[in-house]
């Protein structure tokens, strides 16, 4: 008998011929989350399990698994040999349930048997173990439809696994980072963009980030804030993040000098898209923003459409329909909210017009841009760009 952590994964099991690639990714990510000294991870037909060397490892592994996208749930389980008889199974199970003896629980036994050569079928195991449990815990009752406690028995080629709902914890779900392509996140110091990046990590995308810095208008504290946000995202990506910081000051100064005030934000955003597209080359497949429909005056569908026209790359806006309260809840959960609330504004906030355009037309924006030295400004922003490799 051995103690293991049994790991369940969800959507990966639906991926057909590519399934092994998804499984390899989730195994790699579990190892990265645990760090040095990660135990062997074995596969068993829709499950993974970690071998436990000492009891002190359990809480460490549990915390690590809570940060791995693709993990639907996990449980501390007993792994027994398939040659085990009913009496030995009873001994292990009852010993495990003793900690709940004082409670009056409604329970059920739920057996999954993939090894058809096992001498008892699922129904027989359920009935026999259920009867034995009632003998040991007479205050308990069987309830198949609405149990307070479910005892799971999984009979697999690799062994017989026993665990309960008391041993089980939910995971993040989603897909393992690394299977969903690569994206470049436009990361500001606000609440929304880090959450947008996190939601794409949850869909398996490998992300890096770009932050548009307008020194001296936005100071070092604003930059440090964004670096700290990127560092939080690395703890979910489980890898370093490349943070590109183009020089954006001259672009904003030039736009604000040469273009109508109402168009400033839209033209700034179009410059951001052009610069981000230059950064992607063959490395990234998409841009990601934290834009949210109607949240601020510049984020109307008309303005978003005009901003899109500055690039040929797809732009993912995963928060486009979210309520602000829902975004804040995620930000609190993932650890970015307090950082985002630091009182240092980004370049968009500092250069915002008093009366921004809310229904922009491409012709009017192109007219406003026609005297701008677009290529010169973009090239200078990239030449003076700083790139930081942010590690957790």
From Swiss-Prot:
GO terms for biological process: thiamine biosynthetic process; thiamine diphosphate biosynthetic process; thiazole biosynthetic process; tRNA 4-thiouridine biosynthesis. The gene is thiI. InterPro entries: Rossmann-like_a/b/a_fold (IPR014729), ThiI_AANH (IPR020536), ThiI_fer (IPR054173), ThiI_N (IPR049961), THUMP_dom (IPR004114), THUMP_ThiI (IPR049962), tRNA_STrfase (IPR003720), tRNA_sulfurtransferase_ThiI (IPR050102). Disulfide bonds: none annotated. ATP binds at residues 186-187, 211-212, 269, 290, 299. It holds the Pfam family THUMP. It catalyses: [ThiI sulfur-carrier protein]-S-sulfanyl-L-cysteine + a uridine in tRNA + 2 reduced [2Fe-2S]-[ferredoxin] + ATP + H(+) = [ThiI sulfur-carrier protein]-L-cysteine + a 4-thiouridine in tRNA + 2 oxidized [2Fe-2S]-[ferredoxin] + AMP + diphosphate; [ThiS sulfur-carrier protein]-C-terminal Gly-Gly-AMP + S-sulfanyl-L-cysteinyl-[cysteine desulfurase] + AH2 = [ThiS sulfur-carrier protein]-C-terminal-Gly-aminoethanethioate + L-cysteinyl-[cysteine desulfurase] + A + AMP + 2 H(+). This is Probable tRNA sulfurtransferase.
